């Protein structure tokens, strides 16, 4: 939502109304009510299926655009994800990039405890994907992976991005309880202070 606001899809003030009753911006984005949203979310696993349709449409229409979809590693437990993966490889959708946020946690606990998905790289490879493994917090690695994906021909690409849930906020890092919890005022102030301190460090202001 923040990125869409910065790009001018709606006013920045809309961000202060997140998840308010009747507000434009809800927990699950709505393509019918929110500018800039290509696909509504809700049921896990649907994103990659929609992305496959968009990528196939580009091929059929001889368009050069590329399609990107982001999956959580808990979401990868859904069978629909693997049906879509099989479809993508079968149709040689080399204009499709699947990015998996691998933080090892989901709403019900750890991914491994709920339904283990490893070795995820081997699974995607066996389904016919080019696989790139990266540190999901390293922007240089992210950029390099996206550029490499553009060179892959004849098959889709899966970028497996290893991350830490709640990265940058000490009391949120790797804590499953923060999956859908809103911070109170004190927690919000501490979190923003920690994040600002990291920004200052990276920019050399401290």
Tell me the role of every PLM-derived stretch:
Residues 62-65, 112-145, 196-206:
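Conserved thiamine diphosphate
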Residues 1-83, 89-90:
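Cofactor-binding active-site loop characterized by glycine-rich and histidine/acidic residues
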Residues 1, 30, 80-82, 108-112, ...:
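Short acidic, glycine/serine/threonine-rich loops at helix termini
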Residues 94-114, 118-124:
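Histidine/lysine/aspartate-rich catalytic loop segments that bind and position anionic ligands
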Residues 78-103, 158-160:
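A short alpha/beta connector and helix-capping loop motif
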Residues 21-24, 71-78, 102-106, 137-139, ...:
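Acidic, glycine-rich active-site loops and adjacent beta-strand->loop/helix elements
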Residues 65-69, 96, 155-161:
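Generic beta-sheet signal
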Residues 139-206:
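Glycine/aspartate-rich loop-and-adjacent alpha/beta segment that forms the canonical ThDP
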